[in-house]
Amino acid sequence: MAPSEPKKTFRARLAEKLAASRFFTFSALIHAVILFLVGGVVLFKHYAELPDFTAPTGRLVTDEGRVEAPPEQRPDFTEQIYLPPAPQITAPKLNAITTTNVSTLPIEVAEAAPIVKAPVVDAINKVPANVTPGRPRGVTGPLPATMSARIGGARGRAMVLNGGKWESEAAVLRGLRWLVKVQNRDGSWGGSGQSGAMTGFALLSFLGHGETPVSPEFGPAVQKALVWLTQNGTKFDGRLSMKTEFDSSGVYAHAIAAYALGEYYTMTKDERVIDLLKQAVGYIVDGQAPDGSWAYGYAKNRPGHVSPGDTSISGWQIQALKATHLTGLNIPGVDQALDNAMVDLKRVQCPNGGFGYKGPDDNRFSLTGVGVLCTYLWTQKKDKSVMDGIDCLMAGTEKEYPVLYQGEKADLYAWYYDTQACLMVGGDAWTKWNTMFQTEITNAQAPDGSWPPMRSAPPAVGAFQTESGGGGVLYRTNLCILMLEVYYRYLPTTK
């Protein structure tokens, strides 16, 4: 009989069990680590593709990266961007019309609108209480309240409060990235004869998103565009249409580019563009007709015409002048020209609330938004003129002019104004308009970030809506970007 083995202690038996199971334990641990890592990658990929409008840091986080907090002191633009020195130029003589000039016309003269001081964030009571603007890199000093939500964390909060969706903000980013890809080597956009307008449009799109020359992703594109605009604007003596004389389309191009230059100065306080801005705005002020309108070529008098100007041209001049007013530079003639423009808009308003091309008997539905927006931009009042215009706009849209990108009566030019006008008025008009336009414009975007040709177009716009190349794709893309930036680009304000 074999001798019995000595009884093993508890510790010995435990050691044997652990030794036998060590390979199983190691294998299980490795598999658990792998599953954790794979799951983390999937979740990261999912959330990285979505703009984060609720970042706890107070800054908007989008898929182009986190917007860093600005330095407390003003950024040194001399070292970080390379604009040419401001040219020593003299603005054209500002023969701004006066109320007396207007009163000689057979129309009732409206009381001159009081000068609207550019409000700052702390002084405004119409900005939502929980929108606290930040200042990303390149933005200097407090912005006027109406522009305060285009930067930092305020952008995301304004998006949510005003009914924006992450899909529309993602479309804006795709559009801006497309603009970067198609920018000309010299910094401009568009071909010969269109570069002034298209570069101005593109700058407005970038600035509307809070981008400056020192922005992480879009800064280089903005910088190159400003170099091109300032160099060529100086070359053509402040004519931002980039021609020696103002032709028919030149008054549009000039005003659009001046509009962008005014916004740029307001956001950065870059003093090197002041002289060029003064000269450019001088042409607009000096080119206003006696009745407060603007005409092709800035012609002040046209024999046989009741008015030398038209509402379509006036719309861009008014936007450029309001942007100039917001700079705080107090350029002579600007406020008076805006007062006079309000007199003209009252003159051309139609009995149904719409606005005429040259007068109240020349009603154009596409100009209704022009009249409403431009009136509100300067008067900052929801008066009878504005509300009658909004009623006309909404009734016409719902009954005859639906917001359909590929519809028979599609009109991006009108929608650009209508979108802003409805936001400024707010209420049911904005709720209905936002429902009609936001998804339609977002879904119409092409995969590359541009907006494709449309099936039809109003005669006044023509090929810009329907052509596949040329300036048309730039025109469509910029207007759509600006529409989708409406939630934060300009906020309704009061005096």
Question: In which residue ranges do the predicted regions lie?
Answer:
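Intrinsic-disorder/low-complexity signature in envelope-associated proteins
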Residues: A2-T9, S27, V42-G163, E167-E169, ...
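Membrane interfacial helix-start segments of signal peptides and signal-anchor transmembrane helices
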Residues: A15-V33
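Short hydrophobic "helix-edge" motifs at membrane interfaces and signal-peptide entry regions
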Residues: A20-R22, L176, V281
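An alpha-helical repeat/solenoid feature that recognizes helix-turn-helix modules
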Residues: P133-R174, S188-A221, T234-G282, D286-N340, ...
